């Protein structure tokens, strides 16, 4: 069961992030496959179903991904003005050793280059699919005084340049 179509986009992202973290943790604990492509396909579909007029999604095939460095492109659109902002996104899944072993610097460089030369220009990002077990409270306090649970970081985004500068992220939690 996916997010309700009455949710705002932020609530949908939060719901899918928690679902990603939970399902990924369960799959690793049980030794079952829950692949990066499955997570991507499921989340993109849920977002498109819940917010068809706010988000335009274009998923790249493997040939286009090799050239662009991106798994998908998002356009967040302001309906009345028909203006939007574009993101080129590459996904990486945390493995059972809590690393992003599939990270390739050449792919990150392709993502940065392709997003900058595409017209209209898109912003290059990574979306990291993360898991923790057991779930814990991590991160800074929110404006409401509460800490976010680790499930809130199930889908975490970072600008691609930061990822490249960090030479491939690792998590030691």
At which residue positions do the language-model features occur?
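Extended charged low-complexity segments that act as oligomerization/scaffolding linkers
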Residues: 1, 11-20, 105-109, 114
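Acidic-basic catalytic patches of nuclease active cores, encompassing PD-(D/E)XK
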Residues: 6-58
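Gram-negative outer-membrane beta-barrel domains
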Residues: 43, 81-82
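Alpha-helix termini
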Residues: 49-52, 77-81
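Active-site metal-binding core of divalent-cation-utilizing nuclease and nuclease-like domains
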Residues: 58-68, 77-79
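Conserved catalytic cores of phosphodiester-cleaving nucleases, focusing on short active-site segments
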Residues: 72, 85-93
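Residue-level signal for short segments within beta-strands and strand-turn junctions
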Residues: 76-78, 93, 130
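Acidic, metal/cofactor-coordinating or nucleic-acid-engaging core segments within structured domains
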Residues: 98-173
């Amino acid at each position: 069961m996916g997010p309700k179509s009455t949710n705002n986009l932020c609530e949908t992202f939060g719901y899918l992030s928690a679902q990603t973290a939970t399902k990924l943790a369960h799959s690793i604990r049980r030794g079952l496959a829950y692949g990066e492509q499955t997570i991507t396909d499921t989340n993109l579909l849920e977002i498109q179903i819940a917010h068809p007029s706010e988000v335009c999604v274009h998923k790249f095939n493997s040939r286009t991904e090799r050239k662009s460095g991106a798994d998908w492109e998002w356009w967040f659109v302001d309906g009345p003005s028909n203006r939007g902002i574009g993101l080129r996104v590459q996904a990486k899944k945390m493995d059972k050793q809590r690393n992003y072993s599939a990270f390739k610097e050449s792919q990150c460089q392709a993502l940065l280059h392709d997003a900058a030369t595409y017209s209209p220009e898109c912003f290059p990002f990574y979306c990291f699919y993360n898991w923790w077990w057991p779930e814990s409270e991590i991160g800074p306090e929110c404006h409401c005084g509460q800490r976010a649970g680790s499930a809130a970081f199930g889908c975490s985004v970072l600008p691609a340049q930061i990822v490249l500068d960090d030479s491939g992220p690792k998590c030691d939690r």
